[in-house]
């Protein structure tokens, strides 16, 4: 097995790379010697990150929308031409329009499906021919605890993350014996702008679970490239809870009011600490 601390000569593509988990993942792979292809819509933020990483010609900045299949095709071709290989794909880009299923606009529903589900499926499909030529191939999907247990107020988002996990688990079986690692990490709340900047609209249930940092999720992503884990919830205790809720849905529903009260207290505390409450 390859040294999990050494990614010299390994090319890693990261979507949603400009901030949060994506930026932390870029730093984690970069400090281990990887060559990076940073993908996001905002060119300025990508260039700021590239300068901060200070990896010289080991970084390729690629501003694009992950839902653009032609652009995905082109970036894979350019990556191989520049770095000689495509080794690891991290499907991290995400979009979340919060609210009841009835209140979320049709446009936002479509955007969640396109960004959270269709884009990583297409990126993975397009990357597979390149990954088959790699000595250390892997696809790591960033899912969510909302893809392990349904979250009211995030119905479409939950559906996309359930779908992404299912795709990864099924694809891992399809590719059994080919040596391509397919895995998903399913974090709960993460201390990033993705939820913290709009804390009032985030469900109380979400904040019932321990909050991870972007760096913790990034380290989990790096570890998934080489270990035997296919489906990693974060933190593990939350994974146990979501499994219990899945196996015993009546029990899960009975626990929900208690968890929502706990989450409400956490939200109130966070708002006070950030001067928003």
Short names for language-model regions:
Residues 18-20:
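Conserved glycine-rich cofactor-binding loop
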Residues 32-49:
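Conserved glycine-rich Rossmann-like NAD(P)H-binding loop of the short-chain dehydrogenase/reductase
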Residues 44, 63-74, 106:
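The beta1-alpha1 cofactor-binding region of Rossmann-like NAD(H)/NADP(H)-dependent oxidoreductases
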Residues 100-101, 105-113:
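Substrate-binding pocket helix/loop in short-chain dehydrogenase/reductase
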Residues 124, 160:
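Active-site helix of classical SDR
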Residues 144:
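Residue(s) in the substrate-gating loop at a strand-loop-helix junction
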Residues 174-238:
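SDR active-site lid
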């Amino acid at each position: 097995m390859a040294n999990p601390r050494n990614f010299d000569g390994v090319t890693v593509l990261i979507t949603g790379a400009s901030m949060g988990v994506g930026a932390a993942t870029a730093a984690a792979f970069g400090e281990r010697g990887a060559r990076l292809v940073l993908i996001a819509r905002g060119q300025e933020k990508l260039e700021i990150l590239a300068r901060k990483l200070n990896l010289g010609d080991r970084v390729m900045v690629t501003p694009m929308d992950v839902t653009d299949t032609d652009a995905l095709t082109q970036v894979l071709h350019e990556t191989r031409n520049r770095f000689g290989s495509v080794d690891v794909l991290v499907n991290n880009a995400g979009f979340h329009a919060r609210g009841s299923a009835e209140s979320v606009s049709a446009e936002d529903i479509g955007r969640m499906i396109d960004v959270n589900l269709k884009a990583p499926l297409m990126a993975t499909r397009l990357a597979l021919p390149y990954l088959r030529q790699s000595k250390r191939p892997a696809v790591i999907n960033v899912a969510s605890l909302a893809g392990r247990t349904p979250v009211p107020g995030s119905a479409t988002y939950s559906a996309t993350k359930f779908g992404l996990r299912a795709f990864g688990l099924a694809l891992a079986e399809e590719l059994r014996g080919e040596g391509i690692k397919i895995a998903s990490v399913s974090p709960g709340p993460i201390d990033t702008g993705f939820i913290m900047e709009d804390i009032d609209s985030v469900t109380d249930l979400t904040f019932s679970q321990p909050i991870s940092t972007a760096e913790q999720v990034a380290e989990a992503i790096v570890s998934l490239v080489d270990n035997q884990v296919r489906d990693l919830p974060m933190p593990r205790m939350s994974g146990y809870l979501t499994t219990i809720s899945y196996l015993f849905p009546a029990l899960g529903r009975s626990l929900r009011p208690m968890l929502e009260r706990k989450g409400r207290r956490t939200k109130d505390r966070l708002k006070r600490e950030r001067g928003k409450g």
